[in-house]
Amino acid sequence: MATKSKRTLAIRAMVDRNNRYAIEEALELVKKMATTKFDESVDVAVGLGIDPRKSDQVVRGAVVLPHGTGKQMRVAVFATADKATEAREAGADIVGMEDLAELVKAGQMDFDVVIATPDAMRVVGTLGPVLGPRGLMPNPKVGTVTADVRTAVINAKGGQVRYRADKGGIVHSTIGKSSFEVKALQENLLVLIDSLRKAKPATSKGIYIRKVNLSPTMGPGVAVDLSGLG
């Protein structure tokens, strides 16, 4: 316990809470703070100028990061016939319909993403109470309800992140692993920020991107100087 406390104190001492760091400097600091034995994720929290209580200010979307997330994603697809074949050929880990639904109901959900063809939603719709709380329910707004299952599977396997602003107007995501080069993390971050800007609600007024904090899985946040976001 004492060792953990010393580590925590040492890491916190690296960060000047009153400073806003340039992107590269912030990422270098995050990598330096990732001192655990596993390859920590580099997480980002983006504070948006929205009112999440208003239905017309919901920010939700998905974007493929150019350098991926560093995580191997397992993908399940609800589809039949040719679409099921497309999904398998694209690399889906599990493909089915009623049989897959039975696995979900039994709690056997060894996957990170669920994709469904529009006609499969008659089956998937009944699984809302199970998939919804786990953030696995397919949704057309993030491209997981689609007839183009091939592209959806390739994107999910290739580093796509899905995001949604929480009740505080903050979007939480990951932009890679601490083992990534700073340049790769920076490019991933800028692609995510660009996607968030494109998702800006028309009714959002004032400053939209209000704050950006970066952190390793087991470390404190580092505030980013917004002027470097382009």
From Swiss-Prot:
Recorded GO CC terms: cytosolic large ribosomal subunit
rRNA-binding as UniProt keyword: yes
PROSITE patterns (alphabetical): RIBOSOMAL_L1
Segments traversing the membrane: none
GO molecular function, one term: rRNA binding
Keywords: Repressor, Ribonucleoprotein, Ribosomal protein, RNA-binding, rRNA-binding, Translation regulation, tRNA-binding
A biological process from GO: translation
SUPFAM superfamilies referenced in this protein's UniProt entry, alphabetically: Ribosomal protein L1
Keyword Chloroplast belongs to the record: no
Family the entry assigns: Belongs to the universal ribosomal protein uL1 family.
Subunit structure: Part of the 50S ribosomal subunit.
Reported function: Binds directly to 23S rRNA. The L1 stalk is quite mobile in the ribosome, and is involved in E site tRNA release.
HAMAP family for the chain: Ribosomal_uL1_B
Name of protein: Large ribosomal subunit protein uL1
Source organism of this protein record: Acidithiobacillus ferrooxidans (strain ATCC 23270 / DSM 14882 / CIP 104768 / NCIMB 8455)
